[in-house]
Swiss-Prot record:
SUPFAM superfamilies: L28p-like (SSF143800). The gene is rpmE2. This is Large ribosomal subunit protein bL31B. NCBIfam families: L31, PRK01678.1. Belongs to the bacterial ribosomal protein bL31 family. Type B subfamily. Keywords: Ribonucleoprotein, Ribosomal protein.
Protein backbone atom coordinates (compact mmCIF):
# COMPACT_ATOMS: atom_id res chain seq x y z
CA UNK A 1 0.00 0.00 0.00
CA UNK A 2 1.12 3.51 -0.69
CA UNK A 3 1.76 5.60 2.42
CA UNK A 4 -0.27 8.74 3.22
CA UNK A 5 -3.02 8.25 0.61
CA UNK A 6 -5.72 6.84 2.87
CA UNK A 7 -8.04 9.10 4.89
CA UNK A 8 -7.80 9.04 8.66
CA UNK A 9 -10.24 6.61 10.28
CA UNK A 10 -11.50 7.98 13.59
CA UNK A 11 -14.51 8.02 15.89
CA UNK A 12 -17.00 10.71 14.81
CA UNK A 13 -20.08 12.04 16.61
CA UNK A 14 -23.09 12.05 14.26
CA UNK A 15 -26.18 14.03 15.31
CA UNK A 16 -29.60 13.34 13.81
CA UNK A 17 -31.18 16.77 14.10
CA UNK A 18 -34.70 15.50 13.33
CA UNK A 19 -34.76 13.01 16.22
CA UNK A 20 -32.12 14.73 18.38
CA UNK A 21 -30.16 11.47 18.59
CA UNK A 22 -26.37 11.12 18.79
CA UNK A 23 -24.29 8.24 17.40
CA UNK A 24 -20.59 7.52 17.86
CA UNK A 25 -19.41 5.79 14.69
CA UNK A 26 -16.02 5.10 13.16
CA UNK A 27 -15.73 7.09 9.95
CA UNK A 28 -13.35 8.76 7.49
CA UNK A 29 -15.57 11.83 7.05
CA UNK A 30 -13.66 15.11 7.03
CA UNK A 31 -15.10 17.85 9.26
CA UNK A 32 -13.74 20.88 11.09
CA UNK A 33 -16.55 20.99 13.66
CA UNK A 34 -16.17 19.36 17.07
CA UNK A 35 -18.54 18.78 19.96
CA UNK A 36 -18.26 17.32 23.43
CA UNK A 37 -20.19 14.08 23.94
CA UNK A 38 -21.90 12.96 27.16
CA UNK A 39 -18.83 10.89 28.06
CA UNK A 40 -16.80 14.12 28.30
CA UNK A 41 -14.65 13.48 25.22
CA UNK A 42 -14.57 15.92 22.31
CA UNK A 43 -15.21 14.29 18.92
CA UNK A 44 -15.44 15.52 15.32
CA UNK A 45 -19.10 16.45 14.74
CA UNK A 46 -21.38 15.87 11.73
CA UNK A 47 -25.06 16.92 11.65
CA UNK A 48 -27.47 14.64 9.77
CA UNK A 49 -30.97 15.33 8.46
CA UNK A 50 -32.08 11.68 8.54
CA UNK A 51 -30.81 8.55 10.24
CA UNK A 52 -32.29 5.29 11.48
CA UNK A 53 -33.66 7.21 14.48
CA UNK A 54 -35.87 9.46 12.33
CA UNK A 55 -36.41 7.69 8.98
CA UNK A 56 -40.02 6.49 8.54
CA UNK A 57 -38.89 3.08 7.32
CA UNK A 58 -37.16 2.35 10.63
CA UNK A 59 -39.54 4.16 12.99
CA UNK A 60 -42.71 2.53 11.62
CA UNK A 61 -44.41 5.84 10.91
CA UNK A 62 -44.60 5.29 7.19
CA UNK A 63 -47.84 5.41 5.25
CA UNK A 64 -48.84 1.98 3.98
CA UNK A 65 -50.80 1.54 0.77
CA UNK A 66 -52.97 -1.54 0.76
CA UNK A 67 -53.26 -3.63 -2.38
CA UNK A 68 -57.01 -3.78 -1.98
CA UNK A 69 -57.25 0.00 -2.10
CA UNK A 70 -55.10 0.18 -5.22
CA UNK A 71 -57.23 -2.43 -7.02
CA UNK A 72 -60.44 -0.66 -6.03
CA UNK A 73 -59.05 2.61 -7.39
CA UNK A 74 -58.12 0.93 -10.66
CA UNK A 75 -61.57 -0.63 -11.03
CA UNK A 76 -63.26 2.68 -10.26
CA UNK A 77 -61.15 4.52 -12.82
CA UNK A 78 -61.72 2.01 -15.63
CA UNK A 79 -65.24 0.80 -14.74
CA UNK A 80 -66.90 2.46 -17.73
CA UNK A 81 -64.11 1.72 -20.20
CA UNK A 82 -65.85 -1.20 -21.91
CA UNK A 83 -68.60 -2.12 -19.57
CA UNK A 84 -71.68 -2.43 -21.79
CA UNK A 85 -70.63 -2.28 -25.42
CA UNK A 86 -69.89 -6.01 -25.81
CA UNK A 87 -73.19 -7.11 -24.22
CA UNK A 88 -75.25 -4.84 -26.46
CA UNK A 89 -73.54 -5.92 -29.69
CA UNK A 90 -73.81 -9.62 -28.75
CA UNK A 91 -77.56 -9.30 -28.07
CA UNK A 92 -78.29 -7.55 -31.38
CA UNK A 93 -76.43 -10.08 -33.52
Amino acid sequence: MKPDIHPAYRTVLFHDTAADAYFLIGSTVDTDRTQQHTDGTTYPYVALDVSSASHPMYTGQQRKTTTEGRIAGFNKRFASFGSGSNKETAATQ
